A protein has these predicted regions:
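A short glycine/threonine-centered beta-strand motif
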Residues: 48-50
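Conserved aromatic beta-strand anchor motif in extracellular beta-sandwich/beta-rich domains
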Residues: 74-76
Length: 272
């Protein structure tokens, strides 16, 4: 939820933004308020005002995969012109098509490879990274047609103090799609229309948390999530199980003893 794209001190610049669109559409969490880039090689760049630490980056509500974009790269730099830079993540199109095939790498544990995989639709992207410290960060990509991006986020991720595994519902396994079956007057099947897609409502209950973690880490997130969306990413799969999520309710925080307590939330969202 820590997102420098929405920070007041940050300034956004870009190349190739189509007429009628504005790069500052990326300065909020609203997926419907998108920026559209023209065909060609383009970039979106953030100036954080000073060097900042980040250990995640996310791109949501985009068309990078269905538009078969190539050379998708995220870099950090201390130079506004990116004369020198460090590559934080790359996505390479191995095969064009519907769906296309992508592979890549990203700077986690120094370097982690992303195996070549078929990418259906436009899943939200979330890379977990080793901590990087730069003032400027830039997304670059090449596309043969216009492409939209709705949300970008970089910052420091919040990791849970305790893991949870049994009974958890991974987002990609539980996509919820509302459809309407269309029939003729005579009852002949004409097709199925998708009305809405998203993920099933998920509840996370976190037990045996230290009071200090709740106070220092959970409560700042809670204050953010009361009003704004957040990225929920489960596991280490940059192209799946990443949600642009909103909270529905918070579980009552409870004291277990003088050292430990429990918190939780119920949320829903989208995965593409």
């Amino acid at each position: 939820y820590n997102n420098y794209f929405t920070a007041t001190a940050s300034t956004l610049t870009a190349s190739g933004v189509d007429t009628g669109f504005n790069i500052n559409s990326l300065k909020n969490w609203q997926a419907f308020d998108y920026v559209q880039f023209a065909s060609g090689t383009n970039y979106a760049q953030i100036d954080c005002g000073s060097a900042v630490n980040i250990d995640f980056l996310a791109i949501c509500a985009h068309e990078l995969f269905t538009k078969n974009c190539t050379a998708i790269t995220i870099k950090g730099s201390s130079d506004v012109a990116f004369g020198t830079s460090t590559t934080l993540a790359t996505l390479t199109r191995d095969s064009a098509g519907t769906p296309p095939v992508y592979s890549g790498s990203y700077k986690l544990n120094t370097s982690t490879s992303l195996a070549s995989q078929v990418v259906n639709d436009d899943p939200h992207i979330c890379f977990k990274l080793d901590t990087a410290t730069f003032r400027y960060y830039r997304l670059t990509f090449t596309c043969a047609s216009a492409v939209k991006i709705g949300v970008m986020a970089i910052g420091l991720k919040m990791e849970f103090e305790r893991g949870f595994y049994g009974g958890f519902m991974p987002q990609t396994w539980n996509e919820e799609i509302t459809t309407t079956v269309n029939k003729s007057i005579g009852g002949i099947y004409l097709g199925t229309s998708i009305e809405r897609s998203g993920t099933k409502t998920e509840t996370i209950n976190l037990e045996d948390l230290t009071h200090s973690w709740i106070e220092s880490t959970w409560l700042p997130f809670r204050r953010h999530a009361v009003l704004y969306p957040f990225i929920f990413s489960w596991g280490n799969t940059p192209l799946s199980n990443n949600s642009l999520a909103i909270q529905k309710t918070f579980t009552n925080g409870k004291v277990k003893n003088r050292s430990y307590g429990s918190v939780g939330l119920t949320f829903e969202g989208t995965i593409k």
